[in-house]
């Protein structure tokens, strides 16, 4: 959480208009049912929470079984959203996944912390500590799936 202390009042932005209507495709497709109602995510059920934010040594079994190969976050709700279908593809080299990310496998469990740090340099994925990457990979190997 952050703060900005100002001596001037700011005019707040207008709230974003919901375009969802009666659509609940994201709710239907969430593998862990973390989206409990429109605009409400129960974080302890969310794959993204468990693979990026959680500092627990293990991923709960009920989440682990639903990982579906996700090692760093989960974009299923974004992938199925009809509004995201019209967003143009960003071909910027800075936003493309690095090759090593596409090839995470059992061998990456042997990487030392220095190798992880080198690979993650300049990436927001460095938020995921090396031991967490290993935890997430191992959880997916148990289910024979890896995806990022």
Describe the function of each predicted region.
Residues 1-29, 33, 39-40, 49, ...:
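Ferredoxin-type iron-sulfur electron-transfer modules and their immediate structural context
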Residues 2, 44, 123:
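Flexible, active-site-adjacent loop/turn segments at secondary-structure boundaries
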Residues 11-21, 63-74:
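Immediate flanking context of iron-sulfur cluster ligation sites
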């Amino acid at each position: 959480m952050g703060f900005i202390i100002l001596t001037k009042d700011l005019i707040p932005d207008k709230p974003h208009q919901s375009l969802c209507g009666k659509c609940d495709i994201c709710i239907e497709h969430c593998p862990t049912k973390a989206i409990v109602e429109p605009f409400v995510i129960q974080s302890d059920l969310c794959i993204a929470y468990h693979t990026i934010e959680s500092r627990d040594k293990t991923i709960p079994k009920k989440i682990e079984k639903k990982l579906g190969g996700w090692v760093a976050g989960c974009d299923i709700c974004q992938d199925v959203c009809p509004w995201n279908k019209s967003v143009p593809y960003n071909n910027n080299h800075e936003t493309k996944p690095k090759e090593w990310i596409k090839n995470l496998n059992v061998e990456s469990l042997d990487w030392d912390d220095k190798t992880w740090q080198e690979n993650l340099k300049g990436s927001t994925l460095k938020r995921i500590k090396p031991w967490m990457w290993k935890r997430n990979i191992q959880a997916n190997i148990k289910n024979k799936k890896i995806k990022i």
